[in-house]
Amino acid sequence: MSPAKDVKVYKKILEQNKDIQDLLDKIVFDAQHGQIWFDENRMLLMHTSILGFLRKDLYQMLGLERTKRFFIRCGYQAGMRDAEVTSKLRPNLNEAEAFMAGPQMHGIRGMVQVEVNELHLSHDLKQFYADFNWLNSFEAEVHLSEFGASDQPACWMLLGYACGYSSFVMGQTIIYQETHCVAQGDEHCRIIGKPLSEWENADELIRFMSPDAVSDEIIALQAELNQLKKNIYTEAESDYTMFNAVGESVAYRKVCDLLKKAAGSKVAVLLQGETGVGKEAFARGIHNGSQRQAQPFVAVNCACIPPDLIESELFGVEKGAFTGAVQSRMGKFERAHGGTIFLDEVVELSPRAQAALLRMLQEGEFERVGDSRTRQVDVRLVAATNEDLEQAVKDGKFRADLYYRLNIFPVIIPPLRERREDIPLLINHFLARFENMYNKTLKGLSDKAKNFMMKYDWPGNIRELENLLERATLLTDHQQEIKLDSLFPQHKDLEAVGETAQSLINVEDLFSENFSLDQLEQNIIRSAMDKSQQNVSEAARMLGISRATLDYRLKKITLG
């Protein structure tokens, strides 16, 4: 292939550990928490022999072709994920130099050393040609160890990685073929890569990138099994599906058990819990699980209605009752006749409205504002508050007799931080909704984003989770993964808050102990090095200084 005049040409041997510091800086060993990270993707450090055992077991179960396809597809996904990270690291380099992050990552991962014979690429002209030697291929070694000499190339995962990485970077399907392989007796492995359309056997090559029919069969069987489960699920299981909330945790099920018992009766229910825990969803569940489900469900947020209008909003008004009342109209209770009324933030009711509500609960009757005629309605009341009603009674803000009437069946909705097992379910639930709403298909959350969400305390509970996921869906491009920054732009500040609070030093105590500033600096540096497992780049990031500065100070400590 003769490159076009303006096609970038890159032809030099990749030197081990040269110009890869930007990639190494993305790797974090967090031994304290048992985690290794490459940017936002969680990694594993494992024995290559494990992959050998896996390859052998899959070969015995599925045969050669399906095992090969499995490893190629695994490698393809790994290459795609690395390309997502590395594509943003080198904006000031030319196309070929930036592309080399992929081969460099192959080496950093300990998979293979890449030697460049030839590389031509141009995004504008959609041209690509690559010729690489692979040295020290882990996959060739594994294959020889488990199967002996092969009659065909055996670096399947490495090949998939190259295809996935190059396809992502170039924005078109790039396919590699392994022309030489150590597993079949060659001196080294060698691959050739170019666009799918330039291969004569394109159909055969793309077949290995496509989902295996066995996975389709398994998915079909799983769908059939799920349908059977839906048809025969027990009455006990149905108790947890009657609510419009989402969850499977023990705390969630306890709430469902309580509300299931209340749903079949006429008793007033008081839902208590922090803001955003889903009180209205549970209130709708009570209504849907009762004999009133075919009748109206009316939700009212008492905090949103001015105090001088709350009584007329709830119980209606007669024409001429006050300035602006030009016609008679029903209140919320009349609209909910035969059904359920949900009063959120009930503590915000005015004293007159509280008195009218108490009468409504005790006698089932009320009067419209400006009317003397008594009316009767049949309504089930579900009230909710995020405040302590008992304390509101002590403070004189809420009537004691109304509190006792509402407190017959209190249910406390747990905050999200106490039902963390439900977070993955809620994430899937909201992502499915927002993907449909914004006509996008996303690849879910990055490992680091998932990890952070599971540890976050969620002061805004489910409502906060919902809002963050909607924002992240808008910010994330189609077919991309949601990154932590899209969910929590301030995530670094959030992580630092706890650490800073715990590590503040009492300056007066230091002065009283005649401390040495040099010694304090040395202790801090040593602590950072220990925490980073002696990774200088990571320690420098923790200290907020450059690697060069930390290198200089480490030398001072050593020489001192």
UniProtKB/Swiss-Prot annotation:
Keywords: Activator, ATP-binding, DNA-binding, Metal-binding, Nucleotide-binding, Transcription, Transcription regulation, Zinc. Activity is triggered by phenol binding. GO terms for biological process: regulation of DNA-templated transcription. Pfam families: HTH_8, Sigma54_activat, V4R, XylR_N. GO terms for molecular function: ATP binding; ATP hydrolysis activity; metal ion binding; sequence-specific DNA binding. ATP binds at residues 273-280, 336-345. Induction: Constitutively expressed at a low level from a sigma70-type promoter. The keyword Metal-binding applies. PROSITE patterns: SIGMA54_INTERACT_1, SIGMA54_INTERACT_2, SIGMA54_INTERACT_3, SIGMA54_INTERACT_4. NCBIfam families: V4R_TF_MobR. This is Phenol regulator MopR. The gene is mopR.
